């Protein structure tokens, strides 16, 4: 267990949640939404309602159960060790696979200043170096990594908040309305196409609860950080992407590789574009620290319960799962190097997409877990949280429906493989014969 001086307070963990949510995607969102048009504002409204509902689910369940591990801990408590094991493996995979995709984007922004980074071999080596830097910072301790991420998130917020607040001085209503709906679809179809982009934008809402073991006063701070992080991300997303849609004509915005950079150059000149690239790189690379932290924490929580190899639960004097973090570093390095060829890179793109779906399954389990764990503990808020949970359910399922068929298929295959792995894990940790004569209780 982490010592009190190593634990982190409310502001750093809130910024970690916001940084993990926004990550790299925020800087490309306006270009991705340009294929739909200004009507995307309605998609944002639907998405934010769903994301806030999900954040309130995590906030409430973490106030009832502050066990470290987040979704893993809730699934295990509500549904038993099998779904706990499944949740941990899915989430652990999603965290470190997502890091590999994120570091490539972050280093890509740095290529604005160092063109040599566009060379595949140099890019790969640089990515590996950054991955290990953040593994090392995590080993130093959670307080160090949250400080680094707080600085990185603050830097990333400079162009986002700048455009969100001051971009409106260059906003043209006619530019925005001229591309109100360029999707070729009706109103409902256009909003649905927007949701396929925006629903993914709040992945990371759960990260404060996963890191509960390293947070001071988790029953108070985790719920506040969860909802606060979502609200910060929501305001940044809507104001900045809407402002850019009114600054840059739709035809140009669709082709933009750096919408925030283009908007900054339009408003303040070329130097501003360089500043945006630097801030974007900081935001992407800084979020690596937070995702590495939660990957290590969910694995440690499961290992402590006998549902993951014991090595992931070994900690140093500060309570840091050093061995688990080193294993993460090795796995990320292997995958990073193996994705250097064009064919492998294409396959890894599929793996990255599948890993995002991996996070939705724990979300669904957590929604169900709240209604089970909260049974008899929600008082006069029962109806309120049933409604909130249903909204969060729809949010997650809609995100899965909007995914590609191939991604969903491989996610299902992974679930089947994890089922087989669980039997081996059970036999490894239980030396006695399976209790065939044990009575099965109703409701269990």
UniProtKB/Swiss-Prot annotation:
The keyword tRNA-binding does not apply. GO terms for biological process: amino acid transport. It catalyses: agmatine(in) + L-arginine(out) = agmatine(out) + L-arginine(in). The record marks 200 as: Periplasmic (proximal) gate. Pfam families: AA_permease_2 (PF13520). It is found in: Cell inner membrane. The record marks 291 as: Middle gate. It is a multi-pass membrane protein. InterPro entries: AA/rel_permease1 (IPR002293), APC_superfamily (IPR050367). GO terms for molecular function: antiporter activity. Belongs to the amino acid-polyamine-organocation (APC) superfamily. Basic amino acid/polyamine antiporter (APA) (TC 2.A.3.2) family. This is Arginine/agmatine antiporter. Keywords: Amino-acid transport, Antiport, Cell inner membrane, Cell membrane, Membrane, Transmembrane, Transmembrane helix, Transport. The chain crosses the membrane at residues 8-28, 37-57, 97-117, 121-141, 151-171, 195-215, 228-248, 275-295, 320-340, 354-374, 385-405, 406-426. L-arginine binds at residues 21, 24, 94, 200, 203, 355. It comes from Yersinia pestis. Agmatine binds at residues 21, 94-95, 99, 203, 291. PANTHER family: AMINO ACID TRANSPORTER-RELATED, ARGININE_AGMATINE ANTIPORTER.
């Amino acid at each position: 267990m982490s010592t009190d001086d190593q634990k982190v307070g409310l502001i750093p963990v809130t910024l970690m949640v916001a940084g993990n949510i926004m990550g790299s995607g925020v800087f490309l969102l306006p270009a991705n939404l340009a294929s739909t048009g200004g009507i995307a504002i309605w998609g944002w409204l639907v998405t934010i309602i769903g994301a806030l509902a999900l954040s309130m689910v995590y906030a409430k369940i973490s106030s009832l159960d502050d066990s470290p591990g987040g979704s893993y801990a809730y699934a295990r408590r509500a549904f038993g060790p099998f779904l706990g094991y499944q949740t941990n493996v899915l989430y652990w995979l999603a965290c470190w696979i997502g890091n590999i995709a994120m570091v490539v984007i972050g280093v890509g922004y740095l290529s604005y200043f160092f063109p040599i980074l566009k060379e595949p071999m140099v890019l790969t080596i640089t990515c590996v170096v950054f991955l290990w830097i953040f593994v090392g910072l995590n080993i130093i301790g959670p307080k160090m990594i949250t400080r680094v991420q707080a600085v990185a998130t603050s830097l990333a917020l400079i162009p986002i908040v700048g455009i969100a607040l001051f971009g409106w001085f260059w906003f043209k209503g006619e530019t925005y309305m001229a591309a109100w709906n360029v999707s070729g679809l009706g109103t409902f179809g256009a909003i649905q196409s927007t949701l396929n982009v925006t629903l993914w934008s709040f992945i990371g809402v759960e990260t404060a609860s996963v890191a509960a073991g390293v947070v001071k006063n988790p029953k108070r701070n985790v719920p506040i950080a969860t909802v606060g992080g979502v609200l910060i991300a929501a305001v940044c997303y809507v104001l900045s992407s809407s402002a850019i849609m009114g600054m840059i004509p739709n035809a140009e915005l669709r082709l933009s590789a750096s919408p925030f950079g283009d908007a900054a150059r339009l408003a303040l000149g070329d130097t501003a574009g360089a500043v945006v690239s630097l801030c974007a790189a900081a935001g992407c690379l800084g979020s690596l620290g937070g995702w590495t932290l939660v990957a290590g924490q969910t694995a440690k929580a499961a290992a402590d319960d006998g549902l993951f190899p014991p090595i992931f639960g070994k900690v140093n004097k500060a309570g840091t799962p050093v061995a688990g973090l080193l294993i993460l570093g090795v796995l990320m390095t292997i995958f990073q190097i193996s994705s250097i060829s064009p064919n492998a890179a294409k396959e890894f793109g599929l793996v990255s997409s599948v890993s995002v779906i991996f996070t939705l399954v724990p979300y669904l389990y957590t929604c169900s877990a709240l209604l089970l764990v909260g049974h008899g503990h929600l008082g006069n808020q029962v109806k309120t949280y049933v409604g909130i949970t249903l909204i969060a359910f729809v949010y997650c399922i809609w995100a899965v429906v909007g995914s590609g068929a191939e991604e969903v298929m491989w996610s299902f295959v992974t679930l089947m493989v994890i089922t087989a792995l669980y039997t081996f894990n059970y036999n490894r940790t239980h030396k006695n014969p399976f209790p065939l004569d044990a009575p099965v209780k109703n409701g269990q």
